[in-house]
Amino acid sequence: MTLKAVVGNDKGARFRVVIVGGSIAGLVLAHCLHHAGIDYLVLEARDRVDPQVGASIGIFSNGARILDQLGVYKSIEQLTESPVWYNMLTGEGALVQKVDSLRLIEARTGYPVTFLDRQQVLKILYDQLPTKSKVLTSKRVLSVDHLANDIRVRCEDGTEFTGDIVAGADGVHSRIRREMWRHAERNNALRYLKKDQEAMSAEYRCLFGISTAVPGLAGKSHYRTFNKDWSFLIAIGKDNRCYWFVFEKLDATRRPPTMPRYSESDQKEFVRPFLKRYVSQTVTFDAVWENKISSALTVLEEAQYNHWTYDRIVCLGDAIHKMTPNIGQGGNWAIESAAALTNKLHVMTKTTNQPTIEHIRATLREYEQSRQPRTKEVCETAGFATRLEAFSSFWHRVMSLYVVPYAGDMLVDVHCQAVAQAPKLDFLPLPDKSLRDGTIFRIAQLGGQEDKPIWRVLRALPFILLCIAAYNTMGSTTLVPHVHQMSSTERICLVEFLGDLTPLYIIAMVESVRRGNNFTIAVLWSLFGLVGQSKGIVYAVPLYFFLHYVQCSMVRCSSPDNRHVPIHYASTLVAAVGAGYLLPTAIVLFGSTNLDVSYLWKLFPILMTILHRVFASFAPNTSAVDRIENPRADMRYLRLAYGIGGILAGITRVYFWITPVHHMANLLSDMLQLWHEPLALRNVDLRQLIRHNHLLVLGSGLFWELLHFRDLKNARRLKASWIKVLGVLATTVVIFGPGSAMALGWAWREEVLASKIQLN
């Protein structure tokens, strides 16, 4: 039977995609192709496209944005409820962690993490297809053949269909993938064919299902139970509908053709040891099982394939990238692949309505190459999560119980970094929901270039060279002498230098508690301060600048909540700097000559940090709310801190100007001396040593700020020209000194990061 006899429409001259599989991947691809103006036909083996097999699907922001572009997301959203709470428990039911990370993900991406019946999503996708006649059920494909100008699909019922390409969206046991291998093997064409044929394996199995509301399991919550060799995942959806997964490690790694298949009686045997195990602090799994609507037991196949296409055959979804379901990205990655494939086909068909076979092959290879690196990463992440939750090794257990619970929003950061670069449909407008202010997708729309770590290292290399040069010329120096033994000129130089350091220490304190800088060198700034006090600030500060710049890229503070400085820290910052740095410094500089406290002053970096923590402990910690609802709440305190730092530095400059010492007149000569005679620094007096330290430390600080301004411009967050940036900073240096310039520059950067993103 020909296509014309079945659907009343032959291929003609139009480019057509034959989609095998009415899966999530297949139906989303059909929607994408429709919007791209590309003809398609969907062949589904079952007698309906939306069977209830007990499966659920998690819709994450990377998939939701594409569904929103296609106009189907609102219907899906009506069947879901935005979750808030993530609960992590041990196998004994002890609560390890309860956080609102799911709410934070929605704030960052514009879309909630939602679960619903897979059947519901399939029904929506099918019902909202403009041409349902192009979806044919009971069409189990047997073979695919390449013709001179077309590709032909033969079905079990004897029907045949032709198109320009065949897209395999027929799941993990894909017939189309096997047909692709058959053609490639016949022509000895694919380099890693043998490896692909042996790629699939399974180390775990999963009983998954859907239950009605279970008493004791709160709405808007996800529950994960971790234990040796098994784990639970339960997501509570709309009307407290319960979507659940029971994971268990197999006794051995299985590969085809020895992959086990399970019956309903196997489910009853499997579930028996799990019934009295905890899924929450008070609920055991038997309560979930008693309310079961549907369920299924299956092995969890894992496979990463090297070849996604051959000739005019291409695969997507589980047919070509099969991952474990622990991170919920299987369906979303299928949606991504459907969009990515359509983007390539759209570009090709806009060039010509009748592309050559070689053009088609090249386009499919581009799709393959564009998806492989990102897919490899997510498959590995999913596998790692499965093993982490089942304590596959001692280190998995340690990480689960003693690292992850104390990592703050690190997992949210990892998730958002992964989805931020997700593909979209390039030929359709972006949904308003994804472009809300502060979302990762809005930030990505700025089109800033990705900054690779090696380039950050190279740009920051002058800091290391400065440290080496300073050590070779100045040795180990400290500027904490007995102040009462200084001359008046030396004391004045030291006052100005220490005054200019005030903004630097304020900035370092801010960076040490900024949310986005968790687990970076920025949190250890006080150690650099101690090294500077004992071995020389001219080494410690540039080294801090180097490590901070390399680690703390724009990615770490691009989201509003990661730029945020918790209010209890921001509001006590000035007090901590005043009590921990300014007061001890004033005592050292202007105290009684009979009181030598300079040895205590060496410890001020630690003192300032301790005082900051103590003061902050008395202020309310509103971070949980502010990071989502009001991430700019810290700005008034930061403006105050930067302003006070800049004013104090400016006051010391004014104090210096009204003294007989003409520091600015000697600045150029100092710079020339450092350039032409660096070795002469070994023989300078204390006044010159202070001035040289002043010049090197604050000069490196301004260079550090310029590097961060460069990041702002690269990310297209800063509209001001380099002439304006350099002019403002240079003018401030001349009038108020480098310390005030540092305060102004960092305050400017803070304002840019906190401002609403303008896409025009």
UniProtKB/Swiss-Prot annotation:
It is found in: Membrane. Signal peptide: none annotated. Its main location: membrane. GO terms for biological process: terpenoid biosynthetic process. The chain crosses the membrane at residues 18-38, 460-480, 492-512, 527-547, 570-590, 599-619, 641-661, 725-745. FAD binds at E44, G58, R118, D318, G331. Glycans are attached at N518, N621. Pathway: Secondary metabolite biosynthesis; terpenoid biosynthesis. Its cofactor is FAD. One of its GO terms (molecular function) is monooxygenase activity. Keywords: FAD, Flavoprotein, Glycoprotein, Membrane, Monooxygenase, Oxidoreductase, Transmembrane, Transmembrane helix. Pfam families: FAD_binding_3. It is a multi-pass membrane protein. The keyword Glycoprotein applies. InterPro entries: FAD-bd (IPR002938), FAD/NAD-bd_sf (IPR036188), FAD_mOase_fung (IPR050562). Its EC number is 1.-.-.-. GO terms for cellular component: membrane. Belongs to the paxM FAD-dependent monooxygenase family. FAD-dependent monooxygenase; part of the gene cluster that mediates the biosynthesis of the meroterpenoids nectripenoids A and B, as well as cochliquninone D and isocochliquninone E. The pathway probably begins with the HR-PKS ntnH that catalyzes two chain-extension steps to form a reduced triketide, which then primes the SAT domain in the NR-PKS ntnG to initiate three more cycles of extension to give a linear hexaketide corresponding to the polyketide part of nectripenoids. This is FAD-dependent monooxygenase ntnK. It comes from Nectria sp.
